């Protein structure tokens, strides 16, 4: 098997490497020591198209293959773990689920600005009592037929990009179903925008490393999500 990079891939890797060395590395120590979220670096990456590398061009991305995206995250992470995880959480955990499972309307409304870097994404699954075990989570969304809305209650912890994100994929329990002789929780993913009433931020975590990635608690108290955002349990 030949693992040699193509000329196109090598050019992309060199672009990522030069950006990381010239723009990211000089700030890395300060970012980590001061827990500073590097908004200025994110803005530069937006202009270069780093925030939507694997997203198809028709949705505002660069239309590159997974290897190109991996090389970007790798080169950024070599010099600054914070910057690498900001990009990977935004792309893999927020933009990609919308690309893979979202409706066309959701892709136009959320994926396009995410891929262009106009908005930052985050993903909320982890909870204090369950970790990343989706079946163990306590966050729930109940459908309100009177208003045609989902009402979201619960909290998430250790969420990368925290309060700096604009669009969040939030996982919640939306029902129960019997499978293989036992009751299982039905799980749904919701797109929640920053500023939605009932959605606030809690603790900012103190970490041993990757300290600039703004790891926050997300709190949902009767947070209402329009039903047209999509179907449950899919």
Region locations from a protein language model:
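Glycine-rich phosphate/pyrophosphate-binding beta-alpha loops
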Residues: 81, 130-131, 157-162, 209-210
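N-terminal glycine-rich flavin-associated loop
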Residues: 85-105, 131-134, 143
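A short, Trp-centered hydrophobic/proline-enriched beta-strand micro-motif
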Residues: 117-125, 171
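A glycine-rich, basic-preceded beta-loop-alpha segment at the flavin cofactor/substrate interface
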Residues: 194-207, 214-231
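Amphipathic, small/basic residue-rich leader segments at the start of a protein or domain
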Residues: 1-88, 105-109, 113-116, 120, ...
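A short core secondary-structure module
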Residues: 149-201
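Cytochrome P450 C-terminal beta-domain/meander region
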Residues: 133-153
């Amino acid at each position: 098997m030949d693992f040699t990079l193509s000329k196109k891939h090598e050019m992309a890797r060199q672009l990522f490497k030069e950006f990381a060395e010239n723009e990211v590395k000089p700030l890395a120590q300060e970012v980590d020591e001061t827990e500073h979220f590097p908004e200025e670096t994110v803005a530069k990456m937006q202009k270069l198209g780093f925030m939507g590398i694997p997203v198809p061009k028709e949705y505002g991305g660069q239309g590159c293959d997974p290897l190109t995206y991996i090389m970007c995250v790798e080169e950024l992470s070599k010099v600054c773990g914070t910057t690498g995880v900001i990009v990977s959480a935004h792309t893999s955990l927020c933009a990609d689920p919308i690309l893979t499972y979202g409706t066309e309307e959701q892709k136009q409304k959320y994926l396009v600005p995410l891929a262009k870097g106009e908005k930052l994404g985050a993903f909320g699954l982890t909870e204090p009592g369950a970790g990343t075990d989706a079946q163990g989570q306590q966050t729930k969304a109940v459908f309100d037929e009177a208003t045609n809305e989902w009402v979201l209650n619960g909290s998430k912890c250790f969420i990368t990009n925290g309060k700096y994100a604009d669009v969040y994929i939030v996982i919640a329990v939306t029902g129960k179903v019997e499978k293989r002789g036992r009751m299982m929780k039905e799980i749904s993913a919701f797109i929640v925008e920053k500023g939605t009433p009932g959605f606030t931020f809690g603790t900012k975590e103190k970490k041993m490393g990757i300290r600039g990635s703004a790891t926050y608690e997300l709190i949902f108290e009767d947070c209402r999500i329009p039903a047209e955002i999509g179907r449950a349990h899919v």
